[in-house]
Amino acid sequence: AVLLIEVEGIADAVDADSELVKAACEASGASEIRVATSSEEREKLWEGRKAAIGAIGAAYPAFYLLDGVVPRTKLPQVMEDVLAVASSYGFKCANMFHAGDGNLHPTLMFDPQNQGVLDRVLECAGEIMRICVGIRVCGSVVVR
């Protein structure tokens, strides 16, 4: 897993916030921490984030990308729920998200040669989106 964190503001505040972020990452068991010290390094880190969907596509040419929004405080629980739902359907699921605004992109990877897989993908995607919008028991989400 990769966590890309960007800190913005005036120089003194950015330095202080960066130290807080670094300490939180270390306390959470981060195996590696990289800090961009130039705009070139920053762009290189962002290139990795932007290339994520291409990497998924190279490994799994058939995937279904969703776009949901949840309160930031709910992201850990939603991530667990999304992975549990994907697993219950037998799908691998990658997750990319903008944690700062609660926007997440669960990506279901599947083999299109499997009989009925597209129906299962859409059913699974519907369950995931119901998690994201808080529909637990009733209601409907149209997934196309």
Q: PLM features: residue spans?
A:
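Noncatalytic alpha-helical scaffold of FAD-dependent oxidoreductases
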Residues: A1-R144
